[in-house]
């Protein structure tokens, strides 16, 4: 029996390589699954700062979805590294916008719990 393929319109992130950096296992899996359903090639989840940096340096990435607090360490270095490579980032966080450094204030921010449709739309807006 042949598997049915979803059309590109049903998979709006088709072909995009999205890095997910999230230290909460359940949130990470939920995000990754939703992004795959939308057609993204998911890199990660990276669960800490070092794994996120390694992925940025090793992988071809179109967009990064970053939790701000990774096991007590702030992920702003990841956003800066992505920006240096001209790759858009999106913060998925419980932190208020006032916690984000001024030089990263223009990075899109979604509040947790992240609405997965809003996440998909933010990635579309940043990358397409």
Residue positions per predicted region:
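Non-catalytic signal-transmission and effector/linker regions of two-component phosphorelay proteins
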Residues: 1-17, 115-128
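Conserved acidic carboxylate
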Residues: 22
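Two-component/phosphorelay signaling modules centered on CheY-like receiver
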Residues: 25-44
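Acidic, metal-coordinating helix/loop segments flanking the phosphotransfer/catalytic sites
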Residues: 45-63
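Acidic catalytic/metal-coordinating carboxylates
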Residues: 48, 74-77
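Active-site residues of response regulator receiver
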Residues: 67
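A Lys-centered signature of the CheY-like receiver
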Residues: 112
